[in-house]
Swiss-Prot record:
Location within or outside the cell: Nucleus
Any matching Pfam family: BEX
Region (Disordered): 1-200
Keywords assigned: Nucleus, Phosphoprotein, Transcription, Transcription regulation
Cellular compartments per GO CC: nucleus
Name of the gene this protein is made from: TCEAL3
Protein name: Transcription elongation factor A protein-like 3
């Protein structure tokens, strides 16, 4: 026997029930009871759209952080008031991007540098002084010793240059190494006479 086609036959909630047991009053309630999850989502989405951010979770997180900090755009006005959502987005994002680096990033860097400069350097210098056990007089002596050593080195270097010149002047024909070997500057024998002459 053929049953007449019923509107509710395809619905999941009516599959296990005979047609007689399905009451029209219960149908409306069961639909409402099953939909609260979906309606809750749509309500949240509706709120999000009012804020000017439809559907993007990352943008919503940014907006939530702005609300925690104290609304930056207008404290009493909702963001989407009188403007379409597409116009509200570009204004909120650049402002947030401009303000955050100015507030957070730069001062932290400056604070860190000043803290390092003031705190660490005196501690380090005090520790060094304690390790060395040096007084101001000893420090002056060390500085004097260092300057003397540098002067002596300069004198030795200058004298070394003069000694080399004196050797050439004294013994112009003294042998200075392997000149006949190939690979030495001058190609070996080609410039032998030029090296031996003290002044050209």
């Amino acid at each position: 026997m053929e049953k007449p086609y019923n509107k509710n036959e395809g619905n999941l909630e009516n599959e296990g029930k005979p047609e007689d047991e399905v009451e029209p009053d219960d149908e409306g309630k069961s639909d409402e009871e099953e939909k609260p999850d979906v309606e809750g989502k749509t309500e949240c989405e509706g709120k999000r759209e009012d804020e000017g951010e439809p559907g993007d979770e990352g943008q919503l997180e940014d907006e939530g952080s702005q609300e925690k900090q104290g609304r930056s755009e207008g404290e009493g006005k909702p963001q989407g008031e009188g403007k379409p959502a597409s116009q509200a987005k570009p204004e909120s994002q650049p402002r947030a991007a401009e303000k955050r680096p100015a507030e957070d990033y730069v001062p932290r860097k400056a604070k860190r540098k000043t803290d390092r400069g003031t705190d660490d350097s005196p501690k380090d210098s005090q520790e060094d002084l304690q390790e060395r056990h040096l007084s101001s007089e000893e420090m002056m002596r060390e500085c004097g010793d260092v300057s003397r050593a540098q002067e002596e080195l300069r004198k030795k270097q200058k004298m070394g240059g003069f000694h080399w010149m004196q050797r050439d002047v004294q013994d112009p024909f003294a042998p200075r190494g392997q000149r006949g070997v190939r690979g030495v500057r001058g190609g070996g024998r080609g410039q032998r006479g030029l090296h031996d002459i003290p002044y050209l």
